[in-house]
Amino acid sequence: MPVRGPPIAKIRRSETDNWTPSLQSTSRVVDSQFTFAMLDIEQNRRARKYSSGEMMRRVLWTLAQPLFRFSPRPCFGWRRFLLRCFGAKIGRSVHIYPSATIYLPWNLEVGDKTAIGEHAFVYNLGPITFGERVTVSHRAHLCAGTHDHTKADFPLLRPPITISSDAWICADAFVGPGVIVGEGAIVGARAVAMKDVRPWSIVVGNPARESKRREIIQ
């Protein structure tokens, strides 16, 4: 008997161009327009995503997390020291708050006088670089990790993120993999920046779009 794989979703196009999902008990479906195949999640899980050295550093950083998370709020120097111990490049007078999440310190570079606020999430599977005088407001999310959704094994990708000097990532904003936020730019509250942001521009919305230029008046 033929071996059948688990059900997968097939998209079937109707005469009215509406799209409706149906279940097809095969590992591969071919119709007049598209070919569909299942994700090979087992291969994805077997793939070696981290080196042995990086795995060890992740374990040590997890164990050290309470020293960061439960440090008193004003102890910015202590948190700078702790991040440097794990390979981060941290400039002078950097303020990183204790509820912020730094996923992999050795993939972090922060310029002088930058602030990373409460509950900000720095998911730096790939390198994330902050210039000088950057402000990252509370609950902002910077994601330097994604997957190649065109391949069956769903491989992990780590595109770097760069936040240039004098930029501001506002509350609840999202900056996606591979994005460069230009000098002095502002990513507005809850904006979703999946493309580069021009210097001295202000972007808002989802997807982020430029609303106006930023001017600093002395």
Language-model features: locations:
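Beta-rich strand-turn-strand
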Residues: 171-195
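Flexible, glycine/small-residue-enriched loop-and-beta-strand segment within the central core
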Residues: 71-80, 100-110, 115-180, 206-207, ...
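Terminal amphipathic alpha-helical/low-complexity segments used for targeting or macromolecular assembly
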Residues: 1-88, 92, 133, 166, ...
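Short, electropositive, low-hydrophobicity segments enriched in small/polar residues
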Residues: 91, 149, 192-195, 209
